[in-house]
Amino acid sequence: MKRSMYAGRVREEHIGTTITLKGWVSRRRDLGGLIFIDLRDREGVMQLVINPEEVSSDVMATAERLRSEYVIEVEGFVEARQQANDKLATGMVELKVSALTILNTAKTTPFEIKDDVEVSDDTRLRYRYLDLRRPEMLENFKLRAKVTHSIRNYLDDLEFIDVETPMLTKSTPEGARDYLVPSRVSQGHFYALPQSPQITKQLLMNAGFDRYYQIVKCFRDEDLRGDRQPEFTQVDLETSFLSEQEIQDIVEGMIAKVMKETKEIDVTLPFPRMSYDVAMNSYGSDKPDTRFEMLLQDLTVTVKGIDFKVFSEAPAVKAIVVKGNADRYSRKDIDKLTEFAKQFGAKGLAWVKVTDGQLAGPVAKFLTAIETELSSQLKLAENDLVLFVADTLEVANNTLGALRNRIAKDLDMIDQSQFNFLWVVDWPMFEWSEEEGRYMSAHHPFTLPTPESAHELEGDLAKVRAIAYDIVLNGYELGGGSLRINQKEMQERMFKALGFTADEANDQFGFLLEAMDYGFPPHGGLAIGLDRFVMLLAGKDNIREVIAFPKNNKASDPMTQAPSLVSENQLEELSLQIESHD
């Protein structure tokens, strides 16, 4: 029989009609000789009623065989329910079954197919096809589909061209580790799976495409966390002849459309702009969460003359004030915060509380001489807790920024209904890598430096600024972009600043440098992490919730057992040999 409609879409207007439904048995109940079935499909749940006095013995026998997750087909008459269930969209109606067929049986599932199920992440991933049956998960992917549909319509209307770029590309330095794919034809050579279509989309601008976009898979072999996966999807844009502001206007319009169509939220345009330096100094993060205050305060000058060398001789002393919550933090709680602070390079965490109008705590006695000034600067009040970090400016900012976010979550200070977008601009071009012992690109080596700082490419790299911009949402980096280098001389200077010899630059990026000999236009763009965006719209804290078949924290798939061993024949074809490092 042909399905008439989705079970979850049956409503009062269908009363009096005969329909056919197909789906899964969510629950079966026997009550007073009647059998009640909750039939589930992707649109919801519908109650079925099987009355032994109104159906054949075969139908009744089939109904008695039903168990959870059996796949069935039913035909019946839609009636009004005697007792409505306002928890269901179909709660005003039920289906009086006249015909029933079992399309497939099911073993007992390893966990219940319902929301808020308590089961380990690896079990969910091992049986992902069952996990995805849960209504909450289905809603996540309906939302994701709406987001991508909205984005495509918006960019199509602006005459962006959707172009697919290669999945098998060249491995290049800078950035995260590549996933490598050995070549059978060119033995000893390897492709790399793209970390982004960065260079190819720039070459499309050189080709005259003017406006490009792609919703594209990317791959990075990096340590995983809640908002990272080894393979992920980004909304990739590139444009020619547009300014930084014009690109940002396009992106803001796209996000506004998505928010309106998926969340019915009217976002305020333009988005606020914040310099990188302000973000780091006031929020302790280059992706600040602006839904709450608790800004970092610089006390370096204030404490300079006190008789406490930990403060007076430190390069920087900064603090955050936890307003009105000192009584929530015992010494044991603060010890836990101290251990947390050490993860970010801090040597420790100093603190005082405001108790009975006075500063109290381990370092209070050292602050007596500046107590009035300190109280005024920090706007202290009764029951405030002040946390200090004395260290380099970088360590103080990073530590207090992390503490700020942790404490806000612990104290439930964040309005989860808010969506605070902002641009972080005026970025440094380079960042120092302790691991590499050199400066590396803060974004990538194709970012255009500001005209005012470009001369420092041959001088102090710490002073070079980039025409780069990140878009931030609620403390997450949603995406990043920049204007790109389009002049060969400037690109060669950039490579040299990063430590490439001319031969190395030509070996790695010769095709790009050659392209710059052929009228490369001014261009720029941006990429937004689609998984992360949908995660935030769905109110989740892990992108696995919005990726159909994600990996676990070990970059493994418990369902398919990927990555897996391959046969000796396959390795031999590729001239590969596995060495043990035991």
UniProtKB/Swiss-Prot annotation:
Keyword ATP-binding included in the entry's annotation: yes
Biological process annotations from GO: aspartyl-tRNA aminoacylation
Keywords: Aminoacyl-tRNA synthetase, ATP-binding, Cytoplasm, Ligase, Nucleotide-binding, Protein biosynthesis
Its EC number(s): 6.1.1.12
Pfam families: GAD, tRNA-synt_2, tRNA_anti-codon
Subcellular location: Cytoplasm
Recorded catalytic activity of this chain's protein: tRNA(Asp) + L-aspartate + ATP = L-aspartyl-tRNA(Asp) + AMP + diphosphate
Enzyme class: ligase
Residues reported in the UniProt entry to bind ATP: R220, D221, E222, Q229, E477, G529, L530, D531, R532
Binding positions (L-aspartate): E174, R220, H443, R484
Stated role: Catalyzes the attachment of L-aspartate to tRNA(Asp) in a two-step reaction: L-aspartate is first activated by ATP to form Asp-AMP and then transferred to the acceptor end of tRNA(Asp).
HAMAP family listed in its UniProt record: Asp_tRNA_synth_type1 (MF_00044)
Subunit-structure text: Homodimer.
Official protein name in the record: Aspartate--tRNA ligase
Organism this protein belongs to: Streptococcus pyogenes serotype M49 (strain NZ131)
